[in-house]
Amino acid sequence: LDGFGKTNGRLTGMVKKFIPIAKKSSLTFTGRGGIKLHGSDMPEIMAYRLGGPYTIRGYKVNGVGTGTSFIMGSVELATPIPFVDRLKVNFLQNLRLTFWVDAGKVFDPTIASVLYDRPIQAITAGIGLKINMPGVGPLSVDYGFPLTNPGPNGSPNGYFTFGVGDMMY
């Protein structure tokens, strides 16, 4: 349990830019990064993780890798689904079709990333549905597939991810 009982510091930041397109569509750019500030070996539990619905969609949680620092970005186009507004169902007015690309890399991979032969870096693209439910917040389902080698433990055919809350918290 190397690293436990020691002081470790991390710094994480995020930049997000929304650009409205037409009446109900938007383009979102997101960039995130994190780094270990001080301390000796970072315990696995404190490592940054990439893969899953809030980081690199199209991979299982932690499927890209874990490490002491990371950088990632995402571009997402959200637009209403054609003809859904004609259904006159209130909550469906908040339903959006999304097209996105995620990319990221972890640095100084942890022992788990090495043992499980995770790819450490990934670029994915995909399509999804997002709905903003009153009282719950955004719900999303995405299907993404890797544009880079997913490694021996990843799926070259892609992966579904489900999210509750903001896509890139």
Where do the model's predicted regions map?
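Predominantly the C-terminal beta-signal and adjacent terminal strand-loop region
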Residues: 132-169
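C-terminal outer-membrane beta-barrel translocator/porin domains of Gram-negative envelope proteins
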Residues: 1-95, 99-100, 107-109, 154, ...
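Short proline/glycine-enriched turn/loop segments at secondary-structure junctions
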Residues: 87-88, 115-118, 149-154
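A short pocket-lining beta-strand/turn micro-motif at the edge of beta-sheets
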Residues: 93-97, 121-125, 134-139, 158-160
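C-terminal beta-signal and adjacent terminal beta-strands/loops
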Residues: 101-116, 135
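A short alpha/beta connector and helix-capping loop motif
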Residues: 112-129
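Extended, folded domain segments that form the structural surfaces/walls around functional sites
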Residues: 96, 101, 111-112, 143, ...
